């Protein structure tokens, strides 16, 4: 009877539900197996645990999934010790040194996803780490593992050698005068399609779902040009691949390589088929761009695909000859550009709508947009530089909602014998990171740190490091773009798109909360260490009569 009931229940479960159940069972087995191994960094303390523990308790690992924000906050400011398991003399001695943790110069271990443990470096080690050569601390190896590129895109090369991304900064500088006005026009078309043009009736929409399509169309103009950026079939596939990469990450990252070899192909099966369909969409463009390269025409399309193929012709000819590789590099560029921009823009709009009435945030944004960015003729680099209110709003919203989880600037240790200035002896193969989300909410750096102050950075208060802190400027207290020589090259694209989107939204549309929200902003949701916009958050829009 019991077996029959179990079989009946299993039959009703979907593919991903069955996969999740199997992975959960495997995870528990591996967790108990891991606890029998040698200690990981025995000289570093375990956040949330009593002194001298060798492994995280199940309670602390469970807390990672249910109360990660406070766990990380403790690790940033201090370490939690439990009176029930420590003598008063031990507590006094340890509390006397509590200020030594990541904010004040000492590393700490934190539970991470699945069976893993994270090595978190102190803030004081950031500049040292960012100055290390890639042969010592590698960002590309860290992100290849984090994004599970071997499975999600079929090969680790797309992040271990991410030339499709490093091209962006130089390419954008060369084409900005011609391309940015085109992006603005594309954005206007995408907003009109999804938000409508009715000036009499309010329309309710799911914010993040709508912005996915708006961002996909706008950034596809940059990445693949006008031929595909309005092709709904291509856009649908492009974002499904983005979501498929996320699914693969969730299905593989928690486990050791042996298990990943099984779960990776299973979780990415649909994604690989969709990438093949994207390749078919790209084939005509690929052949056309090859012909342009062979003819050595000077007048070439300004999109990233053309720049990628031009680079590959000179530096990676074996990749240029394979349209499947080019298609996967386009998908890698889509993943970074579309996913990050959508999350950032969603958080910004939620905070703008939820900002305190005393700030009149929308009125300030409208006034600034009217002065600097309402016509294509005005869309210049200098015009963007004058948009200090929009810049401050974007930085403040991103400060409050770190888009990459609680940790940032991951680096994989590539050789033994590497020792930080604080004396932390790093083990080869370890990935280290920093508690960026906590640093961005530090009350010593930001008065009223959890309050959205749209003008915090336009006043010049910032983090006290001199010049005004802009949306794209990185520091130890602001790491959504990373830091140092490998800071995200695509952040300048996000900067342009966010400011254009804010300008168009506030000048062309009225925005409001649905009645059932009671005028209040819905809170972000924590998924382990990821803070994400509230699922299915809705807003009301109506075209303005202007």
Swiss-Prot record:
Its EC number is 1.-.-.-. One of its GO terms (molecular function) is heme binding. Its main location: membrane. It is found in: Membrane. It is a single-pass membrane protein. GO terms for cellular component: membrane. Glycans are attached at residue 147. Its cofactor is heme. SUPFAM superfamilies: Cytochrome P450 (SSF48264). InterPro entries: Cyt_P450, Cyt_P450_CS, Cyt_P450_E_grp-IV, Cyt_P450_sf. Pathway: Secondary metabolite biosynthesis. The chain crosses the membrane at residues 13-33. Belongs to the cytochrome P450 family. This is Cytochrome P450 monooxygenase fumoB. The lineage of its organism: Eukaryota, Fungi, Dikarya, Ascomycota, Pezizomycotina. The gene is fumoB.
